[in-house]
Curated annotation (Swiss-Prot):
One Pfam family from the record: TK
Catalysis: reaction(s): thymidine + ATP = dTMP + ADP + H(+)
Family membership noted in the UniProt record: Belongs to the thymidine kinase family.
Gene Ontology biological process terms, A to Z: DNA biosynthetic process; thymidine metabolic process
Quaternary state and interactors: Homotetramer.
Origin species: Mycoplasma mobile (strain ATCC 43663 / 163K / NCTC 11711)
Molecular functions per Gene Ontology: ATP binding; thymidine kinase activity; zinc ion binding
Residues annotated for ATP binding in this entry: 15-22, 88-91
Keywords: ATP-binding, Cytoplasm, DNA synthesis, Kinase, Metal-binding, Nucleotide-binding, Transferase, Zinc
Active site: 89 (proton acceptor)
Origin: domain of life: Bacteria
Name of the protein: Thymidine kinase
Length: 200
């Protein structure tokens, strides 16, 4: 999806796990590269699931990136020859990234970011609500529900860990529709109650 803008723009690609966010981000980056628009590609350092310094889609497509854990590390490699920036797993950055992204777009830079909008409990994930609020364009992707094969709109955590930032893949997470997500949470509560009763 190539669109030429004379002014900056913030594009957000979001949705649950397994919905193809990284695939869509890679596709947009490749189109920019084809159009000779120099793009800084950034990956959050926290995400080490598939590769340390690459964005990797589930279809196996890869792109080399710089790795950063905060805005200052991005600023060290940014220069005025870049006309676009793409950031994967943006939800893991702190609030400083919000103003930085807004500033870049205000200077005419095309900003493309991807990340989870909600966590395993269907609650807003980190800084994503603020980023969605300042976005010019939002694409919300859907996965396939692990349980019923309908559209999967939420990320379900198989384990009982409550930490919002818990790195994992198929061993820890599933995509689920609203109904199956709620049923899964209820089943986990029932299992916890059963374990508690057995321990008494």
């Amino acid at each position: 999806m190539y669109r030429k803008y004379s002014d900056g723009i913030i594009e957000v690609i979001t949705g649950p796990m397994y919905s193809g966010k990284s695939e869509e981000l890679i596709k947009r980056i490749k189109i920019l590269q084809f159009a000779n628009i120099k793009t800084l590609i950034v990956k959050q350092k926290f995400d080490t699931r598939f590769s340390h310094n690459e964005i990797v889609s589930r279809s196996g497509t890869k792109l080399n990136t710089i790795v950063a854990s905060n805005v200052e590390e991005i600023k060290k490699v940014w220069n005025n020859t870049y006309k676009a920036i793409a950031i994967d797993e943006v939800q893991f950055f702190d609030k400083d990234i919000i103003n930085y992204i807004d500033e870049l777009a205000s200077k005419g830079i095309r900003v493309i970011i991807s990340g989870l909008d909600t966590d395993f409990a269907r609650k807003p994930f980190g800084i994503m609500p603020e980023l969605l609020a300042i976005a010019d364009d939002v694409l919300k992707l859907k996965a396939v529900c692990f349980s019923c094969k309908n559209a999967g709109t939420h990320t379900f955590r198989i384990t009982n860990d409550k930490d919002q930032k818990l790195l994992g893949d198929t061993e820890s997470y599933q995509a689920r529709c609203r109904k199956c997500h709620l049923e899964g949470e209820e089943q986990k509560i029932q299992m916890d109650n059963l374990k508690l009763n057995l321990s008494l």
